[in-house]
Amino acid sequence: MFGSGKQLGMKFSYTYQRKQIGIPDAMRIGKRFIGKDSFALALADNLFIGKEMEKYLSKVQNSRLPANILSVKTKFPEKSAVIEVDIKGRIQSIVEKPSKPNSNDTIPGLYFYDKRSVEISKKLKKSKRGELEIVDVHLDYHKNKELSVIPLSQNIKWFDTGDSHEMLIASNYVMEYQKKNKTLTGSIELVAYQRKWISKLKFRDLINKLPESNYKKTLKKFT
């Protein structure tokens, strides 16, 4: 869909997972891409919406610890990894999809690690679910006091769109959010232009190549 990303002022590379054995396998597969760098691991079915999101990403960048995760309060924490913290924000426990959660704080699918995560992922063994668990990566950092958690405010809306019901809820929310704020959410062309990764001329060229749609009409308003 996006090719090399050159047309957006970005650079993309691709690989694929031969077997679905869990999220930590991404570090194994992407070890050459990661190299000696720190990186973000984002799950494609997770959606974050809110003007303050950039502020929280800045907190991650300024963190002194090599591993950072986010937390959000949810009504059904048992559907995700649950994190428990004390009154000072120190991590007490992390459990993957517990039947009886001891907290309403869950860990959304956006993680930040240093290169050591590659070696951690190589040592992991499959859980009872038959998968490598991303929670075990968190716990490895945590036992070495190298993991921080950054709670997101209620102004940030998070959706796990892993099923059709949640996808519908998220889609309706995005529609109303865009109407209210007169903007586009998740428009890669608009982001590239606003970040000045591409010129106005290139932005217009990208828009002109799009098929006729409301999305195209809305993008034109930003030129």
Residue ranges and their predicted role:
Residues 40, 54, 58-62, 87-197, ...:
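Catalytic-core segments of class I nucleotidyltransferases/pyrophosphorylases
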Residues 35, 52, 143, 166, ...:
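Amphipathic alpha-helical protein-protein interaction surfaces
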Residues 197-223:
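Short, amphipathic C-terminal "tail helix"
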